[in-house]
Amino acid sequence: MTRALFIVDLQNDFTERGALGVTGGDEVAARVTAFLADHARDYALIVASRDWHDPDNDNGGHFSDAPDFIDTWPPHCVAGSYGAEYDDLFGASAVSHHLK
């Protein structure tokens, strides 16, 4: 059987230091990295996605200075920003495909 692993939005803006940070995000990044070190060879495909917003438009009204956290959010994962990059503790060397 062929296996694939999908890693979703493991980015700086979703971990402790980020615009939409959550407690434990860095720990998740470190654990995923450790898992990949031990198990990457078990997968034919390893895909990592990144939330990715264009800095030169309104992103469909997605961003707001007064977000309601339902339909609008503070600016996050803006292309080219630190927040849009993978978390500092995520070692992405085993990732075969990167999606934005």
Question: Which positions does each model-derived feature cover?
Answer:
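Short glycine-enriched, charge-decorated loop/helix-capping segments at active-site entrances
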Residues: G18-G25, P75
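Extreme N-terminal starter segment of soluble prokaryotic enzymes
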Residues: M1-L5
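N-terminal nucleotide-binding beta1-loop-alpha1 segment
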Residues: F6-L10
